[in-house]
């Protein structure tokens, strides 16, 4: 099935919305040892993951199309193995992250995520990686970043007993198809489809989820 790439302006606005949502929700976290929907992670670890991912995105952009991520996706194995390798990378990076309060990690995330947003417009059509013979651009990966930020905004919301829905959930569908090509997107209402495809349950306030 052919999927039309999402509109650039919508992706950029959705990206910024996700960063703002994470910052706003993190400001309301009072217990950083609270459990999250992300498996065994507490809120402090989710904040650390956000910092690591935002810093990685800057690295991947700088090194594209020969980044660590591009080399990982160039491997032609099963998607499940790719997912496990990414999970191991997440765990390893979190393990060596310096100890710091949750708000400090969120501030570092915001700085890196903002720098990424400033850089990507001028590199939108540059090749970011190749997966199973298809070239994916910096703009495509910006869509993946949108998905990442809004999913983790939802995680933070559930951690503090709230719900969350992106302002423009519809753009996350093509963003997923072009930014997360190794994972299928289930059918359904756009935001619920994204939640379910990531391993989250829209109906439950807590439970294990993909990262």
Protein language model regions, located:
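A basic- and aromatic-enriched beta-loop-alpha substructure that forms the phosphate/nucleotide-
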Residues: 80-95
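Glycine-rich loop at the start of a catalytic domain that most often binds anionic cofactors/ligands
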Residues: 49-50
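Structured surface interface patches that mediate subunit assembly and partner/cofactor docking
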Residues: 1-14, 18-24, 28-42, 59-80, ...
């Amino acid at each position: 099935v052919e999927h039309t790439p999402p509109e650039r302006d919508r992706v950029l606005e959705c990206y910024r919305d996700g960063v703002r949502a994470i910052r706003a929700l993190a400001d309301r976290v009072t217990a950083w040892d609270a459990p999250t929907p992300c498996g065994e992670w507490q809120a402090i670890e989710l904040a650390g993951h956000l910092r690591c991912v935002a810093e990685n995105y800057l690295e991947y952009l700088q090194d594209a199309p020969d980044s660590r991520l591009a080399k990982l996706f160039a491997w032609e194995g099963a998607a499940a193995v790719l997912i496990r390798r990414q999970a191991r990378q997440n765990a390893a990076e979190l393990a060596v992250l310096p100890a710091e309060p949750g708000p400090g990690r969120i501030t570092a995330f915001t700085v890196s995520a903002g720098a990424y947003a400033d850089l990507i417009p001028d590199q939108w059509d540059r090749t970011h990686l190749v997966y199973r013979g298809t070239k994916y651009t910096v703009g495509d990966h910006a869509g993946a970043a949108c998905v990442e930020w809004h999913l983790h905004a939802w995680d933070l919301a559930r951690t503090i007993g709230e719900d969350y829905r992106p302002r423009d959930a519809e753009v996350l569908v093509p963003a997923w198809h072009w930014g997360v090509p190794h994972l299928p997107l289930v059918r359904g209402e756009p935001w619920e489809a994204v939640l379910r495809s990531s391993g989250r349950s829209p109906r439950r306030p807590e439970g294990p989820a993909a990262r």
